[in-house]
Every structure is written in C-alpha cells, then in structure tokens.
Amino acid sequence: MKHLPKHLRPRWRYLAVGLESWPDADIDRRAFQRELWFAAQNLIGDAGSAALDGSVLHFRFEDGDGEAVIRARRGEVDALRAVLATLSTVDGHPLGVVVRGVSGTVRACEEKYIRGPQEGTEERTVAFAGADRPAVVRNDRVTVELSGGPVGATALDIRDN
C-alpha cells in the first residue's frame, strides 16, 4: 500500500495536559481515554468527536499528579480544549485538568511541557481546624484527611507540629 502524499496526510496537534486529583486516586490511561471520548460525544456529538480524534498518546498518573499528551486534528484544538474543560471525574475520582501547551510534534510537546515525575510526597501530622490531623504534602499543596473526606489546603492554612 502506498503512502499518501504529504499534502493529503492528516495534520496533527498535540496537547500537553496536566492532571491533579487526591493522593489516593487511582486513574489509569484506559479510564481517562474512555471519559475523554464520552465527554467528546456528549459535547460535540459523534461526527464532531470522530473529526476531533482525541487519542491519548502518553499518560502518567501517580500520587495524585500526572500528565498526558493528547492528539487532535489541526483545526480541532479549540474543540478538544472545550472537551477537556468538561472532564471533572474519572472512575469516581475528582480530576483537575490543565492544558499546559500545544505543539506540532509529540517530541516537542514532551520536551517543552511534560515535566516528568514530580517531587515526592511526604506524610505529616499538621494542625488544621483546631486539631492535629494526618496530611499528605506535595510541593506547595497539602491534602488534609478529615472525617468527611480529604480537603485541599495550602501551607498558609496549616501549622506543622
């Protein structure tokens, strides 16, 4: 089978996406891809999601932080951004999604926008809401365990013990 001439080949753009959730969230590539496709179908329909493509090429998620590289056709980057804005949960875990940048090649996308593994997490006991509570510290973010579930905080909200 012959290759298509260059002017007939599909042109792609690659979005680097940052992911953030609670430290105990377990999100894998398959679940993220499924939620992305469902969100695209719900927002722009079957024909629009087929034109968009939205394939996850690179995925890493651990300890509540992660990143992904998602492929879209050249004219569909804004539609993919809109679809990503509608993602709020994956497998029942809340998820924050931030588009770090757009590039024309996978290599440039990974070199410019994908940072690799974040610094490690640390478990500490902190003073929060008038009591000592267990917490997970990641860079400048703190996740405090309360009886109703985890609560996000910053270094200004807590006091180390």
Swiss-Prot record:
The keyword Signal does not apply. Signal peptide: none annotated. It is found in: Cytoplasm. GO terms for molecular function: ribonuclease P activity. Gene3D superfamilies: Ribonuclease P, Pop5 subunit. One of its GO terms (biological process) is tRNA 5'-leader removal. It comes from the Archaea. Part of ribonuclease P, a protein complex that generates mature tRNA molecules by cleaving their 5'-ends. It catalyses: Endonucleolytic cleavage of RNA, removing 5'-extranucleotides from tRNA precursor. InterPro entries: Pop5/Rpp14/Rnp2-like, Rnp2-like_sf. This is Ribonuclease P protein component 2. Its EC number is 3.1.26.5. It comes from Natronomonas pharaonis (strain ATCC 35678 / DSM 2160 / CIP 103997 / JCM 8858 / NBRC 14720 / NCIMB 2260 / Gabara). Consists of a catalytic RNA component and at least 4-5 protein subunits. Keywords: Cytoplasm, Endonuclease, Hydrolase, Nuclease, tRNA processing. One of its GO terms (cellular component) is cytoplasm. It is an enzyme of class 3 (hydrolase). Belongs to the eukaryotic/archaeal RNase P protein component 2 family.
